[in-house]
């Protein structure tokens, strides 16, 4: 297969960074197609740990071309910081490419994100306050500023003036806070323009040419299926589309160019922020998973809510993404549990349902229907083939395949690249 889309099947934080890094070794291009710096991924190379939020994980391979596609919203300040961070760590960024059509996050987006969240009171949705939502809102309203606009001084000046007139009016008259200085923002962003300029290009053409020439392209999704604007637990979602179908729009390729879709699924379930979570564990088992899995957000540092594996969610993600394979992560975290539960359905109004409900009111009233499986105590972090795993661990994986109807192709048993079991080659 020459093109692979890698997506998260849960609420994000599934371990996509590690799997992307692992698959990037065989890819020629690694492409981010949606989201912004609200998505954090951690990659461990040997004894070194790299935390990235915007630049694709493939940047750690110096010969790979890494693309920030048109579907991504870019905070130039964060981009500058990540470029400097990587250079200080000895990582070259020469092969980074940025879409001319990508939209920019402006300081007023971040301020509005913060104020709007505070204004919701008890109805907060758990935004990261990075300005992602307001930036996508401007994109949909056709008032956003793109990379190509920033690189044209006159056009940028015109668009910034129009935006500031509206945004300062909103900040000052509705929220009662000070607006932004045109001169300060203009000169700050002109500096960013010169940082971005060497990387800016028509990435759609670049990616399509690569596919046509037989090169291997990995599309890296951010967040997860249940944070998708259409298919997630709305309104507790992100402002973009983490599902596989968005790779076409966010990278500028046609759907016939996609050959494989791999869903990254954690061996249990986690969530950051507000919203229903049927299998959430508020007991010592939940705390065990949080500590063993070090479940704290890369972007926010917030402790993640933890729960048992939810087969209803996994089955739903398999359908809306058209998954051809699964990559199961953090299997090692379950080591030491005597009994492991998997939700195979929900009980709602006295009936068992097998489909993920659209209504959050319904979802909040759903109780998980569990199947119990025996756990294992053996250390599996050194396993490199399926037969190295204890029988109970293999049975657990078979159950996931049975529930989802999707074959497992990759199993992660630790944070390092080498702590990976390959059942079927993706590239």
From Swiss-Prot:
Pathway: Purine metabolism; AMP biosynthesis via de novo pathway; AMP from IMP: step 1/2. Binds 1 Mg(2+) ion per subunit. It comes from the Bacteria. Keywords: Cytoplasm, GTP-binding, Ligase, Magnesium, Metal-binding, Nucleotide-binding, Purine biosynthesis. It catalyses: IMP + L-aspartate + GTP = N(6)-(1,2-dicarboxyethyl)-AMP + GDP + phosphate + 2 H(+). Its cofactor is Mg(2+). SMART domains: Adenylsucc_synt. GO terms for molecular function: adenylosuccinate synthase activity; GTP binding; magnesium ion binding. IMP binds at residues 13-16, 38-41, 128, 142, 223, 238, 302. GO terms for cellular component: cytoplasm. Mg(2+) binds at residues 13, 40. Plays an important role in the de novo pathway of purine nucleotide biosynthesis. Catalyzes the first committed step in the biosynthesis of AMP from IMP. Homodimer. Belongs to the adenylosuccinate synthetase family. This is Adenylosuccinate synthetase. The lineage of its organism: Bacteria, Bacillati, Bacillota, Clostridia, Thermoanaerobacterales. The gene is purA.
């Amino acid at each position: 297969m020459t093109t692979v889309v890698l997506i998260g099947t849960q609420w994000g934080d599934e371990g996509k960074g590690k799997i992307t890094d692992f698959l990037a070794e065989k890819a020629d291009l690694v492409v981010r197609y949606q989201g912004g710096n609200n998505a954090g991924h951690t990659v461990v190379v040997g004894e070194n740990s790299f935390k990235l939020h915007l630049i694709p994980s493939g940047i750690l391979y110096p010969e790979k071309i890494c693309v920030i596609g048109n579907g991504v919203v870019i905070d130039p300040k964060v981009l500058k910081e990540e470029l400097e961070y990587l250079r200080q760590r000895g990582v070259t960024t020469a092969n980074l490419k940025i879409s001319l059509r990508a939209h920019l996050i402006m300081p007023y987006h971040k301020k509005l994100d913060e104020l709007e969240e505070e204004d919701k009171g008890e109805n907060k949705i758990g935004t990261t306050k990075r300005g992602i939502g307001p930036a996508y809102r401007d994109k949909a309203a056709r008032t956003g500023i793109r990379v190509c606009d920033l690189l044209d001084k006159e056009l940028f000046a015109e668009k910034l003036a129009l935006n500031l007139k509206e945004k300062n009016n909103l900040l000052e008259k509705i929220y009662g806070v000070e607006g932004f200085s045109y001169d300060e923002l203009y000169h700050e962003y002109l500096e960013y323009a010169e940082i971005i300029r060497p990387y800016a290009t028509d990435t759609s053409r670049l990616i399509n040419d690569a596919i046509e020439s037989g090169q291997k392209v990995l599309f890296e999704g951010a967040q997860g299926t249940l944070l998708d604007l259409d298919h997630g637990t709305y309104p507790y979602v992100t402002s973009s589309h983490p599902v596989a179908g968005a790779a076409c729009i966010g990278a500028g390729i046609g759907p016939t160019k996609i050959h494989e879709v791999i869903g990254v699924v954690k061996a249990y379930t986690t969530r950051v922020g507000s919203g229903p979570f049927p299998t959430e564990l508020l007991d010592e088992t939940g705390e065990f998973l949080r500590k063993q899995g070090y479940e704290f957000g890369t972007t926010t540092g917030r402790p993640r809510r933890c729960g048992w594996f939810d087969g209803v969610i996994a089955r739903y993600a398999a359908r809306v993404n058209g998954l051809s394979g699964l990559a199961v992560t953090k299997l090692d975290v379950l080591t030491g549990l005597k009994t492991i539960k998997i939700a195979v359905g929900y009980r709602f109004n006295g009936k068992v349902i097998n489909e993920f409900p659209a209504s959050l009111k319904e979802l909040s009233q759903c109780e998980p229907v569990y199947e119990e499986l025996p756990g294992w105590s053996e250390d599996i972090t050194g396993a490199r083939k399926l037969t190295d795993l204890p029988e109970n661990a293999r049975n657990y994986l078979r159950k996931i395949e049975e529930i989802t109807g999707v074959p497992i192709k990759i199993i992660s048993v630790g944070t390092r690249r080498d702590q990976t079991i390959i059942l079927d080659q993706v590239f």
